[in-house]
């Protein structure tokens, strides 16, 4: 059936499959097919979830077949993080602007970056060292004078999480502040990724499934 789907739809269906069924399906596919038919059309966080399910040899084979070198590099970096932390859950698809840019510069760069994304949750503002400085609401961009600098209209001190923050705390942060996405920073405050509410809901669902399976196993043992 998947052969009848276009690449984007096939990739989306794969991410929504039951984990065990997905692994059985991927085990019979060549690494090149997995890379070019699915991974090439996924966000980085979804691709990492898929590749984590493979053994190390197959992981390396899949990565070698990814044509976009930048995407492959992002996936390799994300695989280094513990999957139970913010780093293991985050994706790298973001719109990022510099705090000293003018509104016209900001708009130009946003258009370029947005072409590669399905959805834009927030525009993140960084300094010259890539440290997170603020969040840029789209409404402010529309209403601000063109001579304004981003740093003068951005929302300062945004809520963020660290790459090592446990997933449970990430979920609590998103719920507490009613966020649709939260930026992820490293030990020196550099912006390295973002976690969306959809990512969190997927994690909550997976945790519930694991808890159910554990409870079912315990009840059978009693």
Say what each PLM segment does.
Residues 1-218:
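Hydrophobic packing positions in regular secondary-structure scaffolds
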Residues 222:
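Conserved structured catalytic cores and adjacent interaction surfaces
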């Amino acid at each position: 059936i998947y052969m009848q789907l276009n690449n984007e739809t096939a990739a989306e269906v794969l991410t929504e499959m039951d984990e065990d069924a997905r692994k059985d399906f991927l085990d019979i596919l060549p690494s090149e097919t997995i890379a070019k038919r699915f991974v090439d059309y996924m966000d980085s966080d979804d691709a990492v979830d898929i590749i984590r399910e493979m053994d190390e040899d197959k992981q390396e084979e899949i990565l070698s077949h990814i044509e976009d070198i930048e995407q492959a590099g992002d996936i390799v970096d994300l695989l280094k993080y513990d999957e139970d932390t913010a780093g293991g859950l985050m994706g790298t698809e973001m719109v990022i602007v510099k705090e000293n840019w003018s509104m016209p510069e900001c708009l130009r760069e946003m258009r370029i970056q947005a072409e590669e994304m399905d959805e834009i949750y927030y525009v993140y503002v960084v300094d010259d060292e890539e440290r997170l400085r603020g969040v840029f609401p789209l409404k402010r961009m529309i209403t601000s004078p063109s001579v304004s600098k981003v740093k003068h209209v951005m929302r300062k001190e945004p809520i963020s999480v660290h790459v090592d923050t446990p997933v449970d705390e990430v979920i609590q942060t998103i719920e507490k502040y009613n966020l649709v996405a939260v930026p992820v920073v490293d030990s020196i405050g550099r912006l390295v990724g973002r976690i969306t509410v959809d990512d969190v809901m997927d994690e909550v669902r997976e945790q519930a499934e694991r808890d159910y399976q554990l409870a079912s196993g315990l009840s059978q043992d009693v």
